[in-house]
Amino acid sequence: MSYSVQNIRNVCLLGHSGNGKTALAESLLYMTGAIDRMGRGADGNTVCDYDPEETKRQISISTAVAPLEYKGCRINVLDTPGAFDFAGEVIEALRAADAAIIVCSAKDGVSVGLEKAWKYCEERNMPRFIYISKTDEDNSDYNATFEALRARFGNKIAPLVVPIWDEGKKVTGIIDVLNKRAYEMQDQKRVEIEIPEGKDAVIEEFNNALKESVAETSEEFMDKFFGGEDFTYAEMIQGLRQGVRELSLFPVLCGSAVNCMGSLMLLDDIVDLLPNPMEGNYHKATRQDGETEPFVVSPGGVPTAFVFKTVSDQYGKYSFVKVLSGTLTPDLPMVNARTGVSEKLGRLYTMRGKKATEVKELGCGDIGAIGKMEKVKTGDTLCDARKVVALKELPFAEPCYSVAIVPKTRGQEDKIAQGLARMNEEDPTFSVTNNAETHQMVLNGSGDMQVDVLVSKLKSRFNVEADLKPVRVPYREKIRKTVQKQGRHKKQTGGSGQFGDVWIRFEPQTEQDDMIFAEEVFGGSVPKNFFPAVEKGLREACAHGPLAGYPVVNLKAVLYDGSYHPVDSYEIAFKTAAQLAYKAALPEANPVLLEPVGELKVTVPDSYMGDVIGDLNKRRGRVMGMDPTGDGNQVISAEVPMAEMGSYAIDLRSMTQSRGSFTFHFVRYEDCPPAAQEKAIAEAKALQAAEEK
């Protein structure tokens, strides 16, 4: 069934891990008849947590789409992970959604996940509800949670639903503040009850607060309010809807997903108060000439869709899209704005968890999936050839956690690379680099949990087991003293022999990293035709320094004397002689290890500044400055040796309760302090010994 854009709601569920987002989605599906039995995360049978990794870990690790129908509207629920390693999935869902429901637990109050979700919405000017979950569980405290929300986010927080307690402080029902009606659940069915004694005054207070919010949405309503006239129900809905859209009102609802308490009221408010796709996020598009323009969501426009997510598994590839203009149909030719290539659409589907239902079309504003679009990737814009525009790519955070990945069985490096490449189609937030210098395949991600999931999927989906090891630091070596040495190579094994003799002066230089080769030979002691062989031998030798085998930089080598044999001198002999001179000279040239140093920018709340700066000092970091961001955070700029950054992503998360974030980029090489140099040399020699076994 196709829905008009006015009757579509695209809503993402955000919040801290474990606060009940997936359970809420399950409850909404059940109450609308989309499923006939509610699953449980502990049983591994929910609609949205269908991946084997989610079942095993009992957490969400990817965004799932769960469409349902209610009161003539199609509601596309996007259930997102709360674990911060999978924030990329949240970024994808936010692009497809037109509004958010931030789920927080009555047991935990204002959590880090809630704060991050709120910030995501603020950055996008996204309308939002707050849903207080688990109100009926032991140790829950709705009042404390609500007051914490008010204290954190201000008086724009407005309750639409409040719980009812019995004498033992157990939640038994809820009250609809707008309609002043009370309900309880009996066998997962909503039953209206009388408003308990003593609640009337509180409900009246909240109801009047809603009326004040409505009055502020227009002059007409303001005049009516101060004139003492009551608003009709339709006017209340109109005003509340406008307040939600204009971000002057953030309704708070509550309930329990386990027994579906509050779920129908939430559905009512989704339909009545949240925007449809034409009223949702403002989009900017880049034309082919490079100019930007506002993108207007239009049912009658040329077909345009944004690919916000990709699923690629053993059953095939699905490109999840939000239709932003026109209507999509199978076999419709569309141009990929990124590549300029035209490709016919495959079959179209609506997805409910892992269940794909084929459809004949996807209308404007709707969310669905296209099958087998092999050249399409997450972040692409698919357009009609008459109007090719590119919407802004998804703003994924840079990977901040790196490990080396190696197969448990030798020879399976290609299998690991192929498996990671397939999974990178689904999860573009991680990257893989092959470091030619350290001979490591490096996996860069958001944190240890994401990396652990990737390794687990390599085994389950691609039948290859992998180990994780620390990333080796790419040190350099240089000399600090000028030394001159002879290199003499003579080999006689019968017949023609090999002879090469050179004197080379090795000295430090600061002009460039690469070796500078020069010659000061007089009188033909070394023929010019052997100069290239000498230079080649030296450049090859520079790949391994005298201290720990790291590349040598800032070196100047001057060939100034030598001798040759008219019969036995060949290029290979002079190449070998040059390398002998190098090996003899550099250990005497006061060599030193250079370590890579990077620029670190850490964003943390003010309250964690002392801990973070103290930790940077322990990592031999130099704090260069601190800048307030204006929202209670500070950006600390520092220079830190790369060797000290291996576990920083995990350590910062622990120090700041996941409130901190950082970027780190290489800047330059610096002399390594003696203690750090000794440690690096010992590690390099131990690694070399292990590889020789």
Predicted regions and their residues:
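Structural and coupling elements of P-loop NTPases
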Residues: 1-693
